[in-house]
Amino acid sequence: MVVKIRLARHGVRNRPFYHIVVANAWKAPQAKPIETIGTFDPIPKKIDSQDSIPRIKDIQLNVERFKYWISVGAQPSDTVRSLAEKFQLLPKKPVS
């Protein structure tokens, strides 16, 4: 069984919200996952109403479960890989 770590879209129109899930690679993106290991909110939120620049995106991830699934051979999608690289959970992909 090929297992992937990918994003499953939830939320409403113009307001996406993603669950970071471990799922069979051959199933539909909205099919029931094996496990949900985190969430990702791509729309930045203002920290303070007076500050115009500081914004933050909400990412919650169970790092222990992420590392476990990577260790047993789960392949992260490109988006999940880039998120994991930002937090140094995976080494940067070599540029060829």
UniProtKB/Swiss-Prot annotation:
<protein>
    <recommendedName>
        <fullName>Small ribosomal subunit protein bS16m</fullName>
    </recommendedName>
</protein>
<keyword id="KW-0496">Mitochondrion</keyword>
<dbReference type="GO" id="GO:0032543">
    <property type="term" value="P:mitochondrial translation"/>
</dbReference>
<dbReference type="GO" id="GO:0005763">
    <property type="term" value="C:mitochondrial small ribosomal subunit"/>
</dbReference>
<keyword id="KW-0689">Ribosomal protein</keyword>
<dbReference type="InterPro" id="IPR023803">
    <property type="entry name" value="Ribosomal_bS16_dom_sf"/>
</dbReference>
<comment type="similarity">
    <text>Belongs to the bacterial ribosomal protein bS16 family.</text>
</comment>
<comment type="subunit">
    <text>Component of the mitochondrial small ribosomal subunit (mt-SSU). Mature yeast 74S mitochondrial ribosomes consist of a small (37S) and a large (54S) subunit. The 37S small subunit contains a 15S ribosomal RNA (15S mt-rRNA) and at least 32 different proteins. The 54S large subunit contains a 21S rRNA (21S mt-rRNA) and at least 45 different proteins.</text>
</comment>
<keyword id="KW-0687">Ribonucleoprotein</keyword>
<dbReference type="InterPro" id="IPR000307">
    <property type="entry name" value="Ribosomal_bS16"/>
</dbReference>
<comment type="function">
    <text>Component of the mitochondrial ribosome (mitoribosome), a dedicated translation machinery responsible for the synthesis of mitochondrial genome-encoded proteins, including at least some of the essential transmembrane subunits of the mitochondrial respiratory chain. The mitoribosomes are attached to the mitochondrial inner membrane and translation products are cotranslationally integrated into the membrane.</text>
</comment>
<dbReference type="Pfam" id="PF00886">
    <property type="entry name" value="Ribosomal_S16"/>
</dbReference>
<dbReference type="GO" id="GO:0003735">
    <property type="term" value="F:structural constituent of ribosome"/>
</dbReference>
